Structures are given as C-alpha cells and as structure tokens.
Amino acid sequence: MVFKIADSIISPLGETTGENYLAVKAGRAKLCRYDHHWQIPEPFTASLLTEEQNQRLKIEGLTRFEAMAYHSIVGALRQTNLDVKAKNVVLILSTTKGNIELLAEQPADKSPIYPGTAAQHIADKLGITTTPITVCNACISGVSAIILALRLLEAQCYDYAIVCGADTQNPFTISGFQSLKAVSDEACKPFDLERTGLNLGEAAATLVLAREPHQDKGWAIKRGAVRNDAFHISSPSKNGEGARLALAAITEGEAAEGLAFINAHGTATMFNDQMESVAIERAGLNETPVNAYKGYFGHTLGAAGVLETILSMAAADDHTILGTRGFEERGVSGKIKLSNQNAATNGQQFIKMISGFGGCNGAILGVKSGEVNSERVNSEKLMTHTVEITPKAVTVDGKQMACEGEGKALLTDLYKRYIDNYPKFYKMDPLCRLGFVASELLLQAEGDRRDTPRDDRAIILFNRSSSIQADEAYQASIQDAEDYFPSPAAFVYTLPNIVTGEIAIRNHYQGETSFYILPERNDQLMQQILKASLGDKTTKSILGGWIDYEDDENFVAKVFVM
C-alpha cells in the first residue's frame, strides 16, 4: 500500500485538480469539433488546450509536451515539502507518444523523440537526480505507472514516487486513430447504444505517492494488477478475460459492498465498452455503480489512468459518483449500473480499470487508509536462460547459433531457420520481429512451451528508442499532403508494448505485460523493476530484458527468463 500526498491536473477544463473536479461535477466539457485542424482532412471532436493555455504553460528549452508535464508536477510538488534532489525520490512518466509531433520535422537526430529523453529533460528541469522511468504501455500507461510506483515503494527502492501522466494531440495520433475508424466526429457516448467512437484529449496529471502515510486517513493505492487478453493486438477479447483477471487480482478478499464505484475506461468505442461490461459482470461487480470520464476530457492516452484516478479520489471525498457524460441508454450486454447523473455515495474505496492495445488491461484499488499494509512477496529469482541478438550474431545461453545475413536480414534468417511456423511474423514491425524471434529462441531453450493459457508468467521489456521504426513508417503515410493515406497497419505498431502483446498471443500468456523506456540502458535499474514486479503474487516467472531497434543496422535484444 502506498499513500497519496499531493496531486495536480492540467486539462482544457482547468489547471488544478479542484478546477477540473468542479467542472466535471457541473457537467462541463471542452470537447469541440475541428474541421481541417492541423490540415487533417477528416473532422474530429477533441478536448485540446487553448492557445492561451499553451502560451501560459510554455517554458524555454522544453517542448509543449514536456512543459505541460512539468507544470503539472510543479503544481503537485507545491503541496509538499519534498526534496526532489534526494536519492529516495523517483520520477515515473506515463505517456504513449510523448514528443512524437517532432517527427514531422524529419530530424536527423531522433533521440529527442524518445520518451525516455523527454522524461530526462523534465527530471533535469525539476532537479531530480535519480533516473526517470517512462511507462509506455498503450492506453493503460497511467495505471501501469501507478502500479510501478506501488511496487517500487513497497520494495523499499524509494520512499517517494512522482507519477505524471501526459500526452498532447497532433496529426500523428489523431490521424492514426482515424485510420482505425475509432474516432467520432461528435461528442463521445460511453457505453451508450448510439456510441460511434472516441474523442481524443490533452492533459497532464500528477500523483505524488509516499511509502508511509502523511495523514491519519488519506487516499492510498492498496493493490494493482496488469493482465493480458492474449487475443489480439488491437481488439479486446469478447469475454474480457484480461480485464476480469485484473479485477479478480485486486478484489481478492475485498467486500464489493465497500466500493463507491468502478471508474471504467469507457472510450465509447464499440468493442472496448462491450468488453468492459462483460468483464465487470464476470468479476461479480455488476451491482457496483460504474462511470466513465471520457465525455468530459476525451481520451487523454498516457494521462488517462492518472487523471481519472485523481478525479475518482476527489469525487469519493465529495461523496459523489460522477455521472457518465454522453450516456443515455445502455448499449452493452454486460448488466452494469450506469447513469449520466451525479449520485451520492458513502463508499471509501473505488476501482480504476483500463485497457489498451497489445491486449493489456490494468486495475487498481484506491482506499481511504492511514495504515501501512504491505503485501510484498519474495522477489529473489535467478536467470535461467538468456538470448542475445545483435545485427551480426545471436547467442543462446552463451552459445553462438548458426545464422546468415546481417541487420534486418538476420532476423528473417533466424525466423526461417529456427521457427518458420508463424506467418504473422511478416506483418510485424522491426521491433516486434526482434522481440518475437528472441522470445522464440528463449522459450525453445527453456523447453516449456504450453498450448493452454497461463497467467503466472509476466512479459516485462525495456528499451530506449520506443517504437521509432514503426513511428517513421506511419509518419511517411501522412507526411505528404498530396499523398496522404494514414496506414492502420503501420499505426497499430507505433506503441512499443505491442511486442509484449505479440509474445503473449503467441504463447497464450495472460499474465502481466509491461513496457518501460529508459534514457539509456541501465541493467541495475531494470533488475530493480523486475524484482519489484514479482510483488504481484500471481507472477511466478518473468520473460524480461532489453529490446531496442533504432534502425536496421542498430538493434539489440538481450532477453532472459527469471
């Protein structure tokens, strides 16, 4: 259990948590329809910061994304006396695309686009001296970041975690979701019979968490879990298995009657809302009120999990279940309790659930508590098998393997020579090909291939360059206004965690899948995170390591089972 000591939200609705909460309670939203905005041909509805806000938040030396995150963090830190220079403080940044809008300028040096670089810029500006960790786990990134903070603090790696979720919007993200036919040009309607898709939004939200309580009965994160559907990289499973497993993990031994509400992801896409309703019902929580906040903020991507957790804390403090804006008539098969009106509650607990591309699902349990209640488990594990792949060679458990070719041709040769029974390999982006081949060789060495689902193995990977190769491929499809054709096949791979989803699908792994980005490779920090991740008592082993693909001549995979 870890404890909230401060929070902050910046969005089009306001620049403090209080301003945002009061706006939502009053039913206000900043969703606006845009026609030909940023020269995007198709109309869309989104919640974007005003030009006045952008100018007010501007900081010399920081990008728009970095400045928004910085201001949110500073807004939270002002409520504390935290010494951010201390070695017991860590910054955890949650984002899906960070500085991706810089890619349109086609820079020779791509490193400013890497999310870990952005995190380091923010940390340096704040004076934080420890290495920042970026969580890039698709739409569940914010919840994943809170869970990572919970684990690192419970494992006593740090005493304080500054968790900031942030994303800005731009032609890259908006056209990408449009290419998937997921965007509505009208205000979204979560869980509604007439829902037609999501709206995107901009926001930054920060939670400062502590290992020890700072007040008698404040908000705490008691449990958190991430589980995978092992079904499809861009579509949730029909039975909501990953979400159900995540809910089951955080509610074990808890009385549902104590819950004020479940704050769902509620994107207003056809399949997400349907899946969540089924998962909630299957988890036995269909008598608990459910709400969603996308009708106020839009889908704020990497900010969503943090923003919506903070808002849920504020609502429960106000004894209020916030209404689901845009909802009128239930349009999902799961029999869940929804309303577009605010309602009263005396509950002192809530669940925040979320799902994302790559098959990932996350959930956390927020409670009012002043009591330390750690659920740490033994985290001592040994590496049993290792695989290393470079552009010129591959080794398995220290033994060099026969192969031909160099660069990307090497990966194709390894696939044909040692695997050759999974044609989807040829549809994958380079990062996924690298991770897929490395994992296949690793599991062959382990000799424990299973055809039935298992949730006791996690997949936790790290890198520096995120999904830069897929990003460039997608950017090429929208770069030229005369040859504008956003590619859904390319866009779906513009998240590095997709490689964890591909491995999970191949092997029926329904345990945790997480992806972290560091400014530079740091084996000690990676081991710290992996060991802390074993705090999830369901996880018995981890397929983990470093998977980085900067270009066809510069890539490395070093993965292992522990």
Which ranges hold each PLM region?
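Glycine-/small-residue-rich beta->alpha transition segments that form the dinucleotide
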Residues: D167
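Alpha-to-beta junction loops
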Residues: C157-D159
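Short, conserved alpha-helix that lines the donor NDP-sugar binding/gating region
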Residues: I146, L150
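Short conserved active-site loop signatures built around small residues
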Residues: G142
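Conserved "HGTGT" condensation-loop signature of ketosynthase/thiolase-family condensing enzymes
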Residues: M1-I133, N137, R151-E154, N170, ...
